């Protein structure tokens, strides 16, 4: 848990998920492998997804539970360090010039999409209220 909670940067998550496979796993899934000291690396894309959807969530939840501002700040800093996601929801926001600069912002746009846009709750959306206040 301490390794997960300590992640503040994208590279910390990448390092967390880089490790050596034990003899058991190498021998079990790679029976013809001659070198049992094989390092397995998760790619950067999957590492980023783990940072967004696992590491930051666990750190934030545990920080909230234990009232640790340090853990909450670590989770926030991590999301700010990871690039924005690139999925259909974020592409839709990009098409109207709501560009997410990092995962923190893309998660906010994703939340708006799933809670308001998809459910047809446009009039309840905080963004709609903001646009109306500014006469847009």
Residue ranges of predicted features:
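Acidic, carboxylate-rich catalytic segments that either coordinate divalent cations
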Residues: 98-136
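Hydrophobic, aromatic-lined core segments that form the binding pocket/scaffold
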Residues: 1-107
């Amino acid at each position: 848990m301490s390794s997960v909670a300590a992640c503040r940067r994208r590279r910390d998550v990448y390092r967390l998920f880089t490790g050596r496979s034990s003899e058991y796993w190498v021998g079990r899934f790679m029976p013809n492998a001659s070198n049992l000291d094989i390092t397995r690396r998760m790619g950067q894309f999957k590492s980023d997804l783990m940072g967004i959807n696992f590491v930051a969530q666990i750190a934030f939840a545990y920080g909230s539970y234990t009232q640790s501002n340090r853990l909450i700040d670590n989770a926030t800093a991590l999301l700010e360090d990871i690039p924005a996601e690139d999925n259909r929801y974020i592409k839709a926001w990009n098409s109207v010039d709501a560009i997410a600069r990092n995962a923190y912002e893309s998660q906010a746009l994703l939340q708006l999409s799933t809670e308001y846009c998809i459910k047809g709750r446009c009039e309840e959306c905080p963004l709609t209220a903001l646009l109306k206040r500014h006469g847009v």
